[in-house]
Swiss-Prot record:
This is N-succinylglutamate 5-semialdehyde dehydrogenase. It comes from Vibrio vulnificus (strain CMCP6). Keywords: Arginine metabolism, NAD, Oxidoreductase. Pathway: Amino-acid degradation; L-arginine degradation via AST pathway; L-glutamate and succinate from L-arginine: step 4/5. NCBIfam families: arg_catab_astD (TIGR03240), PRK09457.1 (NF006992). One of its GO terms (molecular function) is succinylglutamate-semialdehyde dehydrogenase activity. The keyword NAD applies. It comes from the Bacteria. Signal peptide: none annotated. It catalyses: N-succinyl-L-glutamate 5-semialdehyde + NAD(+) + H2O = N-succinyl-L-glutamate + NADH + 2 H(+). Gene3D superfamilies: Aldehyde Dehydrogenase, Chain A, domain 1, Aldehyde Dehydrogenase, Chain A, domain 2. Catalyzes the NAD-dependent reduction of succinylglutamate semialdehyde into succinylglutamate. NAD(+) binds at residues 220-225. The active site is at 243, 278. The gene is astD.
Amino acid sequence: MTQWIAGEWVEGLGEEFTSLSPYDNQVVWRGKGATAEQVEMAVKAARQAFVGWKTLSVAEREAVVLAFAEQVKENSEEIAQVIAKETGKPLWETRTEAAAMAGKIAISIRAYHERTGESQKEAAGNQIVLRHRPLGVMAVFGPYNFPGHLPNGHIVPALLAGNTVVFKPSEQTPWTGELAMKLWQAAGLPQGVINLVQGGKETGIALAESKGIDGLLFTGSANTGHLLHRQFAGQPGKMLALEMGGNNPMVITDHYGDLDATVYTIIQSAFISAGQRCTCARRLYIPLGEKGDALITRLVEATKKLRVDQPFAEPAPFMGPQISVAAANFILAAQANLQSLGGESLIEAKAGEAAFVTPGIIDVTNIAELPDEEYFGPLLQVVRYQTLEQAVELANDTRFGLSAGLVSTDDGEWQYFVDHIRAGIVNRNRQLTGASGDAPFGGPGASGNLRPSAYYAADYCAYPMASMEGEETSLPATLSPGVEL
């Protein structure tokens, strides 16, 4: 039973698909996808549940969400184990994701009250009241890299606002999506408030094209996000929130401070989660000269020693495999393409068993036209530069704008960087992959729109209703010109 529709677990009627553990290619989940007809059943179930859910008090909706948070905490180890088996991420990392699933709920609740909710004031004898109302049925598309944590950043704010949800997990991580829904069920969520539809491309197309949804909240690749953007053109009545990828630059200056701390910050930025975070550093700008040379030498040495292994290995690995063999092949093909354009590998990424790829670092300074692509894996491109102004200009030469970072102890360099860089997340002397759940998450350009995450998601899950109210009608002291009573 792979679909959860109107509170009932039912078998998919579409094509069979499986989830393979990327570190050994073993089947960890098997089921059938939802057909277009089943997707419509899920949308209708969400619509039928909408009125009852939105008319509950905020406190009542919040109580269900908090019950889900307790389920997540009580089952955190099972969540971590499932995510590790399905994504190949190290167990220490998936445990942090399970904890973040619960932590983000508290942020979402606070955000609802601070950014939406209700408020009123008196002005000129009138009560000015601001209320917020849910949009309706929200389609939520989840990614594979954080299959438990990231969908929560859409689903929980949507539910708190009074929306109902049809959730489609990534076809790479159906097991995690199924487990999350079972925890919602155990939390006492009313039937139809969330509906789960599993499947691949056809299931996703059917959900995105459904006339019954009022919005679509998406985290995933830029290519898919741009297709959705074109599909939703001319439909201003539907909310579309996109969080996509980035070709993220990290600039190191001669004032980088401690050598080992800088190397560690680069490794955490480029290779954590095997490079499968949308905020990972893809382009590394290093100054020409002795200090830059020393940094590269140390970075190469440290990268060669990174432990790459299956998630339950002892001692624990730093990173695991790519999500699939196809994803691994994509990284190797990208490396080969950069080499053909004139790039020189400082460490060559190599294929291992199943979907494993070792980290690669390639000097692309001599490539005249560097492809502006997101290589979603452990492939770091190095560019040598002469001046900070040149580095920032090169860093901004991208259609994306998700994250960027500067490593420098010089306050003047930081001020120049933050004044001229174009990105939504800009860090100094910290890894690019570091972000706060209280802060906006996202960036301009091809990286998306709005700011999907726990706190700012409240903004796109409800619309403001402004009212000017009085206890009764009243006549002004002077009637408008041309009016007689």
